[in-house]
Amino acid sequence: MKKPVKNIKKQKAQNQTKNIKKQLKEEVNTGLIDGIFVYTEPLSILEFATKINKPVTVILKHYFNQGLLLNQNTLLTEEQMGELCLEFGFDFKKETSVTKENILETLLDTVDDEKHLKERPPIVTIMGHVDHGKTTLLDSIKNSNVVASEAGGITQAIGAYQITTKNNKKITFIDTPGHEAFTEMRSRGANVTDIVVLIVAADDGVMPQTEEAIDHAKLANVPIIVFINKIDKPGSDPNRVKTELMKYGLVAEEFGGDIPFIEGSAIKKINLDKLEDTIILISELENLKANPDRFASGVVLEAHLDKAKGPVASVLVQQGSLEIKDIMVVGTTFGSIKHIEDEFKHKVLKAEPSKPVVVYGLNQVPKAGDKFVVINDEKMAREISEAQLKKQQEEERRTKQAFTLDAIKQHIDEGELKNITLIIKADTQGSVEALKNSLSKINISGVKINIIRASVGAISLSDISLASTVRDGLVIVYGFNVRPDAIVRKKAEEDRIEIRLHNIIYKLIEELEDAAKGILDPEIKEVVLGQAQVRALFRHSAIGTIGGFYVVDGAITRNAKIRVIRNGVVVYDGEINSLQHQKQDAKEVKAGFEGALTIKNFNDIKEGDIFEAYKLEQVK
């Protein structure tokens, strides 16, 4: 006689709790084990000597011979312990003790036995330029694959939906409002996409957001399908699109590449079935599988607070099956799931891998990109959630980016820094090419320099979002004759992204090389005091052009340096000649007020220009 499903689930919950408690109790054996030194954390010289059965004086003498006077209580770094292990002739390995702070990662990294894995639907994100038909393509796919009576009933709040093709295959589409949402989740370590469909209009070709989409797709390291849209429009030229995309490394199969290109029309539903078939084919080649018979885990797509229903989260199940009454731990949040519904607001009893659903019952609103795990023991779930909160608070006190340009010499010498990732924004394509060429010639021993974006234009929020996805090493956004605005600067500060600004190529290159050699000059920090928009122009025969402005951020001060920015590009950098407020000489004009100024040796001011006041300070 079969056990009731309820009892089976209860037994599974008990087994899961026992397993978690066992992992938390298990201690990692450290010290010399079979010729390998095993450790979990940095040790003092005395602790290290004891574990390798050596007199502490031997280690102190080793450092004395190197000119270092240490004592037995000096804490050794992981690199120093590694060097000592090699000195004494044995290998070394770091093990991680399982704690309530990291148990979620342990559970998420659980590898299932192959025999428990079953085929799952692919998860697809459509990306591309804003006017190239992404929304139309999503709508056409939705309406072609759902029952007519429900075609208009898909809620946009879920952030994803699942279709069933004519061949009875399921595909999940992530419906993101822009590249930022996709990037934000990746910056939090959540890789949710299996395949990216890049949509490009046949009559328009590659546009700035197309380039951004390519950058994001390549960083996600997933297969790309190109859908050339609007082939029904006059002036469409699919071959031009294929040629343009070649310089980004996207070469069509017909030209000897490995990227599938599909020519179609979203609005007229031309070749949508071919697109779906290609997605299914690639998913089969990728061998996408998951175990549906374990406790669920996955990622939050979107979340908000509903005044009537409380915290509401759209989630994507990646492993296991999510059911009502499951207790979900999501980052620092947890709760018993009271209700699950799909994109049609239909009640869902069980959500299997690749299924997007909306859940109710968490005690707080989670963040997009947070990973969740079902732990069906309320006491344990609460304790783990509290531990996650403590861990998050500690991490927030630390700097997000461990490396800065000023200190990379030390990190390179200690073997901590292996990658320097650059985003380059410049005033002209010629500047972009010159910078890429010069940077490619830099040789820093043991360090790889990666340029993940190099394009024309002002430093934007998209650049900062892309930089935030880099998980390894140092990332720098370089601006050459271009500037970030106040919103971008604030976002960069919040995300701990370093922005460096230059107007001479060799100085930019020199700065990077000198930093690697540890001979970087004392840092001169630029402090932006304020920005103002030019709203009126006045001509004066004696003093030249007067720019009437409105201060949008900070203040414009009389003794500050001033630069003129036009469409994100610096057109002049100099000094203020005169500053007035209400036709009176002024020392400063603050945000929310109007003023007027003249600039020494510069009269080519235009309406819409941005005045940026700044000063230079040496960092102590």
Curated annotation (Swiss-Prot):
- SUPFAM superfamilies associated with the record: Initiation factor IF2/eIF5b, domain 3, P-loop containing nucleoside triphosphate hydrolases, Translation proteins
Q: Which coarse location class applies to the principal site listed for this UniProt protein?
A: cytoplasm
Which terms does the record give in the GO molecular function aspect? GTP binding; GTPase activity; translation initiation factor activity
Which keywords are on file for this protein? Cytoplasm, GTP-binding, Initiation factor, Nucleotide-binding, Protein biosynthesis
Superkingdom as given in the UniProt entry: Bacteria
The subcellular localization recorded is: Cytoplasm
Does the keyword section mention Cytoplasm?
A: yes
Q: Where is this region: G4?
A: 229-232
One Pfam family linked to the record: GTP_EFTU
One GO cellular component term noted in the UniProt record for this chain: cytosol
Summarize where GTP binds, as residue positions: 128-135, 175-179, 229-232
Region of interest (G1), ranges: 128-135
Looking at the record, which segments are called G3?
A: 175-178
List the InterPro entries.
Answer: EF-G-like_DII, IF2_II, IF2_N, P-loop_NTPase, Small_GTP-bd, T_Tr_GTP-bd_dom, TF_IF2_bacterial-like, TIF_IF2
Boundaries of every tr-type G domain copy: 119-288
Question: Which region ranges are annotated with the description G5?
Answer: 265-267
Instruction: List the residue ranges of the region (G2).
Output: 153-157
Function statement = One of the essential components for the initiation of protein synthesis. Protects formylmethionyl-tRNA from spontaneous hydrolysis and promotes its binding to the 30S ribosomal subunits. Also involved in the hydrolysis of GTP during the formation of the 70S ribosomal complex.
User: What is stated as this protein's family in its record?
Assistant: Belongs to the TRAFAC class translation factor GTPase superfamily. Classic translation factor GTPase family. IF-2 subfamily.
Q: What is this protein called?
A: Translation initiation factor IF-2
Task: Identify the taxonomic lineage of the organism of origin.
Answer: Bacteria, Bacillati, Mycoplasmatota, Mollicutes, Mycoplasmataceae
In the UniProt record, what gene is named as encoding this protein? infB
